[in-house]
Each structure stands twice: as C-alpha cells, then as structure tokens.
Design a protein with these regions (language model features):
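Ligand-binding loop in jelly-roll beta-barrel domains
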Residues: 106-131
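Generic protein-terminus/edge-of-domain signal
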Residues: 1-100, 107, 115, 140-144, ...
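An amphipathic alpha-helical interaction segment
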Residues: 122-124, 129-133, 150-218
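Short, locally clustered residues in the helix-turn-helix/winged-helix DNA-binding domain
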Residues: 80, 197, 221-225, 269-273
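Short, charged, solvent-exposed linker or helix-capping segments at domain edges/interfaces
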Residues: 132-140
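Pre-recognition alpha-helix immediately N-terminal to the DNA-recognition helix
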Residues: 211-219, 260, 264-270
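Basic/polar phosphate-binding segments, predominantly the helix-turn-helix DNA-binding elements
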Residues: 200, 221, 226-265, 277, ...
Length: 318
C-alpha cells in the first residue's frame, strides 16, 4: 500500500498557560509522524469531523518515559500486544493486549517515573466540542455516538479480541493515498468504535478472563519466586501446554513467558528500593539464571540497568 507523502514530520509539544493551575504539558498531536515505530495521522489528513487524530506505536524495546501531560480531546488507547502503564490522579493502571484505556479532555496522565514498556498500541482522540456532523454522520447517528461518548465512564475495559484486526486495518487504510481505501478505513474505524466504545454495556472489564486463566494468573503471582514452568502452570489449570499458551495470549494479548518476565521486572523494581538487596540478590530471588541475565532482561523492559534505575529512584511509583 502506498504511504502518504506528508507523513515525514516530527511531533511537537507545547506548554499552555492556565490561570491558577500549575503549568502542564500539552501534547496537541496535530503534526504528522511516520516512522517505523511511531505514526500519527492528523485531522487534516483524516478529513473525518471530530476525529482529531489516530496513531500507532510499536515499541520493540523499552522507550522513554511518557511525561505527565494532557490533551484537549477525549483520548482512547487500545493495547494490541504487550504491556503499557499509565498514571491518572496518582493511580497506576497496568494494561495488557486487548485493554482499552480512556482519559477525559484536559485530564493529566503519563507513565510515571518509568519508561514505556515493550508493546504495540493504537490511540485516537475525539473532539467533543459539538455533536453536529460527529464523525461525518448525520442525525440520529451522529447524536447517538456523541451521547454515548459523553456518558462513557470506563477508565479501562476489554475490547473484543476479534475487533483488534479491524482497528489495525482501519489505521492502515486511513493512511493510504487512495480515497477508496480511506473510505474503507473510515468504515472499519466506525465498526470498532460502535462495537467496543459506543456500546450500551454496563460493565466490560478484566473479569472477562476465563476461570482457568484467572487460576493461571493467581498461580503465577503466588509462585513468582520459583522456577515457573509453563507445563506445570498449564497442568494446574487443567489445560495442555499448547492450549494454555494459546488461550493465555488470546485473553491477555501477551504470551505467558512475556507476562511472567514483565511481572518479575516490576517486582525487581520494588526489591531495588531496599539498599540491602544487591543486584545479584534480586536476580536470584526472582530465579534468573545469573545477574547478567537479569540485567539484560531488566534493561530490555525498562530501558536502563538495575543500577541506573536504583540510583535515579525511578521506582517511586511502586
């Protein structure tokens, strides 16, 4: 698919002065970006009323921390793979594949003191200033979607796993130079929004995990200091190893091995707060084969070494 020629600029950020409020970082997301791991389509490129932007990020190694900031629009983040963390009003939200995360206009959020994790996600923003011609629709459809978003109260919820490829396809087609493909992308985007965000459901949260996968998660958390074997975890849940791995990834959007490793890294951050724990102590407490192996994994998931993390007190959010 040919890529649009105007997608080569870098994103900019700016400060907005707000009376009687501490100076806050505003990220307008109004400049096109098109790199291997970070892409943004702006409202001028999209030509869809009220859709301020849509972006795609694919971090294959830990990235820089996301500073606390706000947008003037309602923002949704849909995690496709891996793990992502955000802090809003001092509360930490940990997201995995298939999770949807929402922030309101002008609401401060960021990744806290830590780096962004290995993950892939799509995010988009709605301009909620008017229901007229919302998302290019006419009444009653425009008013229905606008009203559903105004009444949206889920900080996090689960997306339908089958709709994730729909959202990915929407982004790909919206970035095309062909108008016919842009129209298809618009259709796919509306399909995802109506099926997963502008719904009439009362509660769609992490409780959708099946009983056996909930058992696996509990087992992993309670045996984290041990040598966690996939076959043993699968047997504990009454599943074959192959079925367990497939079902775990289907429901969490991340492999059991990646989930365990990520959890061990988060636990290591807590252990590193204790000056009595050496790097080697932490490595062996969490069953890494060596301190070098631990340091290598820690760096991949956080973007820094355990020593650097400890010295700079990045663990203050845990």
């Amino acid at each position: 698919m040919p890529l649009r020629a105007d997608l080569q600029q870098s994103c900019r950020i700016k400060y907005i002065k707000i009376p009687e409020v501490a100076r806050m970082l505003h990220i307008p997301d109004d400049t096109p970006v098109w790199t291997d791991d970070f892409r943004i389509l702006t409202r001028e490129q999209l030509n869809i009323p009220a859709l301020h932007m849509i972006g795609h990020a694919h971090f294959q190694a830990a990235g820089a921390k996301l500073d606390t900031h706000f947008h003037c629009n309602m923002e949704f983040v849909v995690v496709l793979k891996g793990k992502q963390q955000y802090i809003v009003d001092g509360k930490l939200y940990t997201l995995y594949g298939n999770d949807i995360f929402m922030t309101y206009p002008y609401e401060n959020h960021g990744s806290g003191g830590g780096s962004q994790d290995v993950c892939e996600f799509i995010w988009f923003q709605f301009d909620m200033s008017s229901s007229q011609n919302f998302l290019g629709l006419v009444p009653p459809y425009s008013e229905y979607l606008f009203r559903q978003l105004l009444n949206y109260r889920h900080r996090t919820k689960k997306a339908n796993m089958k709709d994730l490829p729909v959202l990915q396809r929407a982004f790909q087609l919206l970035g095309s130079e062909e108008i016919s493909q842009q129209i298809q992308g618009y259709s796919y985007f509306l399909q995802f929004v109506t099926n997963n965000i502008c719904t009439t459901d009362i509660e769609l949260t992490r409780e959708v995990y099946s009983t056996d996968i909930q058992e696996a998660i509990y087992y992993i958390h309670t045996h984290l200091m041990e040598d966690l074997n996939i076959e043993i975890i699968a047997g504990h849940c009454g599943l074959s190893a192959s079925r367990f791995k497939a079902k775990f990834k289907e429901e969490l959007g991340i492999t059991p091995h990646a989930y365990i490793t990520s959890l061990k890294v988060d636990t290591a951050k807590i252990f590193l707060k204790d000056p009595g724990n050496t790097i080697t102590d932490v490595a062996y407490q969490l069953n890494f084969s060596s301190s070098n192996h631990f340091s290598s994994v820690f760096r991949k998931y956080t973007g820094c070494t355990p020593t650097y993390f400890r010295n700079h007190r990045f663990s203050n959010i845990y």
